[in-house]
Each structure stands twice: as structure tokens, then as C-alpha cells.
Amino acid sequence: MKRIVADFETRSPVDIKICGAYKYAEHPDTDVTMLAILDVDNPTDIRMWIGPNFRHLHPTEVTDKELADIVDNCDEFIAHNAPFERAIWKYIMCERYGFTDIPIHKVVDTAVMCSMVGLPRNLEKASEFLNASGYVKDMEGSKVMKRFIAPKLPVAAKRKQLNPKNPDLVKSMYERAMGILKIGGVPDFEYHQYLDWYEDKKDFCRMVEY
């Protein structure tokens, strides 16, 4: 039996805690930064698929064809809180990047398995409870990862560059856009110019290690 464990990292201007996994995944500005794939039979070999829009920051270790072969031929697709992975796979990997959908009977959710036996659903807490050997929370890596997941307010110099006469307008338009985007909507104005994404090659490589 071929079993793989999958873990997505994504970025989006919408807040998943407010709009939920499916509206988050459906939003046109949500994108996959990377996907970690692990073969259960070879747990020390974690391979990274880097999203097409982020390969200028780090080369992908798994090609699109290799990833398609791995997922299409697996018997179990394992993820913690699998509805998120399923939503990202369906709305981004399939509809945007051309991968094949994963049959529901192949999906295994380890968070559900934790609930079934009375363990915490939170991955870190469940690992602590089980005294999982080798599991150590990488706090620095987690901090770096959080820099990439959402846009930040443009710095004053960039706000002035976007609108030399009224840089405060850029700030107010950014805040207006973020207010709408966070609930999964799309503003009725061209908001992309007001979003400032964090893209640092060194930190992205650190996130891959995380």
C-alpha cells in the first residue's frame, strides 16, 4: 500500500479563520507557496513541490509530473485537518494548475483519528501527548512562515511612490481592500496595487527547511 503525507503552505489576503477553508481556497489571490510530500515507508525523505509563482525564490524538488504520479498512484493521501488540503487541491492544484482530483476514499485525516481516540486535534499538542520522538516545534521557522502567509501594509516610501500627493489614501484603500478580502469577497476596485507581499529569498529557503 502506497501512503503519502501531505502538508500545504499557502498565502492569501483572506482570513481562513473568518471565511473558512473553501472560500479561502476559492479566492483568486490565494496561492500555494509549497507542498511537502512524505512517503510513509520512507519517513526521512521529505520532498518539496514549490508553487509555480514562487520558483524564483527556490527551485522545486518535485516536478509537476512527478507530483501528479505520486498523488495519482497513492492508496492513501494523509493530512492533518484534511479538509484544508482537499480544498486547496481541488480549487488551486486542479482548477488552476491542472492536477487530477483526489477521490474522497483515499483521504485520511489524522486530526479526525486523534478525535476518535480522545487525543487533542491540535498537531503540536497531540504530538506532545504521544511523546512523538523527533517532533520539535521549530519556532523560528514558524515565525518566518507567518511572514509569507498574508500581505502587509506597504511601507511609507512605497505608499508615497504609489500616490505621491496623498500616500494616506494608499493606506486607507489597503485597509478597505483587506476588510473585504478577509471575508472572502473581492473589492469593486483594482486593489492589487495596494497589496505588498513579503518575498525574501533567504527567508523562503528557511521556510522550505521548516
For every predicted segment, state its role.
Residues 33-38:
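Short beta-strand scaffold segments in enzyme catalytic cores
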Residues 1-31:
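Entry/capping segment at the start of metal-dependent catalytic domains
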Residues 41-64, 70, 75-210:
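Active-site-proximal helix-loop-helix substrate-binding element of RNase H-like nuclease domains
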